[in-house]
């Protein structure tokens, strides 16, 4: 007799995707006893068994499986509504956690004879198991929806294969990702959906194929898809190991390969192979051993969540070896275990925006349609019923809008939960709308049938669900998505938006519908609160949308309003105002430094450096998307964040942004340190005085030296000593009122440097004081003995008239106005310099063009 845990199936149960879970001391006889044959036909069979040494061990596995699958168990029955592969993986995980030895048998047939029919001794109905040990294995409905979404792709859609091409951005992503891996051992590639992350991963892992590589994916279908792509790229199957619970053989041309979940075989293969590529599901990752040179985590936002060991976090939290590459379109930052943790995830080494993919032609474009709240003929008695009736009408309005351009549109409706999906479905069907519903509590065959019906429909059709098709499932013909409930997670929002963005020949733009509690009679900013998280998420992926929010008259965007009886333009203006300033309408949320689109702001910084040959000045302005901004504010934020990053402190900058900055000329010296470096200038001053017999000769403390990257040492020293002269003994404020004890404003260390250097030559650099205040007349003019700096400035002014050769040698371009305008002459004359930012007391801001003919370019 053989004891064991089993999962059995009967055609009557299989039709409902139900599977019988049990344990027995006699696997050969179990399916032939009365409890199986009295009410069912003789068609029972095992899906799989875990043979154990004792019946008690088998009972513990059963109890553990039923505990972990509690959300998918039929009440008071040992029936579970999960895929057999899912139950198998769960059973093995339970057995491993409980330290129970077993032998896995797939679809076994045990020989039945008279000797096998034995009355089994009864065991306590509730064996003692450590639920704490198994808590991380509990399957939640949300997790299963995502898992099912991964698997349904394989059964339901065929991906269109295209010729292999290395796009320019893919090469750049691979290079930057690999360099970051070599630098820090961890890197994130954030690339929009459908933009070729797998190809980039292949280009990177090619550098590690002499060793061992692990490629983790969140589901069986993605495992197959990843294998197919890597095979297409040139990976040989002889050095590939697939770890997953689907035993179906995969055939690729003349090659074939199978998955496995045999822990002994897996460990032996990994340890003994000199080179190996392992492709595994996160769910099977507990079977792996820590011996990889590179670990790639695809769709890595799935790892985030609670800080606990579970299949999705097993490798991240427990493996110590190897570099880590994380791939995602939507990083997750809102959970205890999040991608903000740079020790675990590293930083973003490369980013490719959704808008870039659209403009390059790899992703379908889309329009936004906000849907006004319609008036109800009869007011329901409850708020919940009112909301439901309004959303139903808004869904019908959205479908009608699609039908004006598309014969048989398909629309996904994302709901708050399964309860809302059921309620909306019932109401839509009652009103004659062709609607379908799919969610994780339905039998799998029903879901697949519904999904197939939706995909193949030749009529306008709606499919309601909560999270089932939020990501992973591709519907090439999908035309629109409708958010029946607000979403707050940027990840959820962007993944949902991307569902209808498959690129197909002659496919019209997709539509994203956002229902609002707004009509022409109840317009107020609070009514727009539900779209603010949506707008924030979209603006981070689509710089054009961000610019449109700042100035719609200059930057067009496909956004409109349906169901409004008033002025659509006024309603859109209110919506944009709520998004930009919040529902209180007070603070400009979009122009904070960290919100400015990096590519646009960095492009202006790069232009200033490469064209103007300098870094930004304090009063440089920036005109972006209709906003008048002081560029120095963003520039200072960048420097602060850069220094935090280099000091390994929490920083807002990602590695790819740091790489951008360090690509600029003299970034670490002039960009971070400023145009007038103190130590460098003091070294030059000390050498100069030694070579010129202690004479400063001439110095310009009026124009402030020259801030350009090509500045001479004397020009930089002029800037430093201009600052010293301005700070030395400033005792008056702007309104000429005395400010006691605020006289000497030079930092002590810098004062010591000046004392030491000038003191060697008995030169006086400090201004005279009386009782701590400068010697000044009633008009604030200095009346003390001139300092060596002031005397050198007098000489400079004389040399401008009498010794122009000397001036040109040490202050080249002075005669052409370079120092006066702090711009290269040709930059000034052609108006290429950044505009000057000016703020007025009334709150208005102005950018004034720097050129021979000053003119306002923006009020």
From Swiss-Prot:
Record flagged with keyword Electron transport: no
Motif (DEAH box) on chain: 298-301
Family in the record: Belongs to the asfivirus helicase A859L family.
Protein name according to UniProt: Probable helicase A859L
Helicase ATP-binding domain span: 178-349
Any single Pfam family the record assigns to this protein: T5orf172
Binding site for ATP: 191-198
PROSITE patterns linked to this entry: HELICASE_ATP_BIND_1, HELICASE_CTER
Major enzyme class: hydrolase
InterPro entries: Helicase/UvrB_N, Helicase_ATP-bd, Helicase_C-like, Helicase_Restrict-Modif_Enz, P-loop_NTPase, Phage_T5_Orf172_DNA-bd
Coiled-coil features, chain-numbered ranges: none
Keywords for this protein: ATP-binding, Helicase, Hydrolase, Nucleotide-binding
EC number(s) reported in the record: 3.6.4.-
Alphabetized GO MF terms: ATP binding; DNA binding; helicase activity; hydrolase activity
UniProt entry tagged with the keyword Ribosomal protein: no
PANTHER family: ATP-DEPENDENT HELICASE IRC3-RELATED, TYPE I RESTRICTION ENZYME ECOKI R PROTEIN
Helicase C-terminal domain location: 401-553
């Amino acid at each position: 007799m053989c004891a064991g845990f089993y999962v059995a199936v009967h055609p009557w149960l299989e039709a409902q995707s139900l599977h019988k879970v049990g344990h027995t001391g006699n696997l050969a006889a179990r399916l032939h006893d009365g409890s199986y044959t009295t009410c069912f036909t003789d068609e029972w069979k095992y899906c799989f068994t875990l043979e154990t040494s004792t019946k008690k061990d088998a009972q513990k596995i059963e109890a553990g499986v039923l505990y972990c699958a509690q959300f998918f168990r039929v009440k008071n029955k040992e029936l579970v509504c999960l895929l057999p592969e899912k139950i198998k993986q769960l059973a093995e995980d339970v057995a491993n956690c409980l330290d129970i030895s077993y032998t896995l048998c797939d679809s076994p047939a045990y020989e039945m004879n008279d000797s096998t029919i034995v009355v089994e001794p009864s065991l306590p109905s509730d064996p003692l198991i450590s639920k704490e040990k198994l808590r991380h294995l509990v399957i939640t409905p949300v997790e299963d929806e995502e898992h099912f979404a991964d698997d349904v792709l394989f059964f339901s859609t065929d991906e269109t294969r295209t010729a292999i091409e290395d796009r320019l951005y893919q090469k750049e992503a691979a290079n930057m990702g690999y360099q970051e891996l070599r630098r820090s051992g961890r890197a994130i590639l954030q690339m929009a959906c459908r933009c070729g992350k797998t190809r980039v991963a292949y280009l990177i892992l090619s550098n590690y194929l002499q060793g061992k590589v692990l490629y983790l994916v969140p589901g069986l279908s993605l495992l197959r898809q990843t294998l197919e792509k890597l095979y297409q790229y040139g990976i040989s199957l002889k050095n590939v190991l697939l770890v997953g619970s689907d035993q179906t053989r995969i055939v690729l041309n003349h090659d074939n390969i199978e998955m496995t979940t045999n822990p002994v075989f897996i460990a032996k293969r990994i340890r003994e192979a000199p080179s190996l590529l392992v492709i595994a599901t996160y769910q099977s990752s507990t079977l792996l051993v820590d011996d990889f040179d590179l670990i790639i985590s695809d769709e890595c936002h799935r790892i985030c969540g609670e800080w606990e060991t579970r299949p999705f976090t097993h490798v991240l939290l427990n493996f110590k070896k190897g570099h880590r590459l994380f791939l995602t379109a939507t990083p997750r930052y809102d959970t205890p275990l999040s991608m903000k943790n740079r020790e675990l995830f590293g930083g973003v080494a490369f980013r490719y925006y959704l808008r870039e993919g659209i403009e390059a032609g790899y992703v379908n474009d889309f329009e936004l349609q906000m849907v006004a709240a319609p008036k109800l003929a009869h007011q329901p008695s409850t708020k919940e019923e009112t909301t439901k009736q309004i959303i139903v009408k808004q869904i019908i309005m959205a479908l009608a809008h699609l039908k004006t351009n598309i014969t048989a549109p398909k629309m996904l409706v994302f709901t708050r939960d399964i309860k809302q999906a059921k309620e909306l479905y019932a109401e839509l069907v009652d009103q004659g709308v062709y609607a379908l519903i799919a969610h994780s509590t339905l039998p799998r065959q029903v879901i697949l049938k519904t999904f197939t019906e939706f995909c193949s429909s030749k009529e306008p059709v709606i499919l309601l669900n909560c999270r089932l098709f939020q990501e992973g499932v591709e519907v090439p013909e999908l035309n629109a998505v409708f958010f029946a409930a607000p979403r707050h997670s940027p990840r959820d929002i962007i993944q949902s938006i991307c569902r209808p963005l498959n690129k197909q020949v002659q496919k019209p733009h997709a539509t994203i519908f956002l229902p609002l509690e707004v009509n022409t009679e109840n317009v107020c900013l609070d009514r727009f609160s539900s779209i603010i998280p949506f707008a924030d998420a979209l603006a981070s992926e689509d710089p054009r949308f961000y610019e449109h929010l700042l100035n719609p008259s200059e930057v067009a965007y496909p956004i409109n309003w349906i169901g409004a009886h008033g002025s659509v333009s006024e309603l859109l203006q209110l919506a944009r105002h709520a998004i930009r300033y919040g529902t209180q309408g007070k603070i400009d949320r979009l122009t904070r430094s960290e919100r400015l689109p990096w590519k646009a702001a960095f492009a202006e910084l790069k232009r200033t450096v490469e064209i103007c040959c300098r870094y930004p000045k304090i009063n440089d302005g920036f005109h972006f998307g209709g906003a008048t901004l002081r560029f120095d504010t963003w520039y200072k934020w960048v420097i602060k964040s850069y220094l935090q990053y280099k000091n390994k402190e929490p920083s807002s900058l990602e590695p790819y942004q740091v790489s951008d900055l360090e690509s600029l000329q003299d970034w670490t010296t002039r960009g971070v340190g400023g145009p007038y470096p103190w130590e460098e200038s003091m070294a030059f001053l000390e050498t100069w005085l030694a070579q010129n017999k202690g004479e400063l000769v001439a110095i310009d403390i009026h124009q402030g030296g020259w801030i350009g990257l090509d500045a001479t040492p004397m020009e930089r020293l002029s800037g430093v000593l201009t600052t010293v002269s301005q700070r030395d003994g400033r005792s008056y404020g702007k309104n000429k009122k005395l400010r006691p004890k605020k006289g000497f404003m030079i930092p002590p260390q810098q004062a010591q440097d000046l004392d030491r250097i000038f003191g060697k030559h008995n030169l006086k650099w400090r201004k005279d004081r009386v009782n701590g205040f400068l010697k000044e007349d009633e008009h604030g003019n200095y009346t003390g003995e001139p300092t060596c700096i002031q005397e050198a400035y007098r000489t400079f002014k004389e040399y401008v008239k009498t010794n122009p050769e000397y001036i040109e040698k040490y202050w080249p371009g002075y005669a052409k106005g370079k120092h006066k305008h702090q711009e290269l002459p040709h930059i000034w004359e052609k108006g290429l310099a950044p505009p000057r930012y000016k703020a007025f007391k009334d709150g208005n801001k102005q950018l004034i063009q720097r050129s021979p003919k000053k003119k306002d370019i923006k009020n």
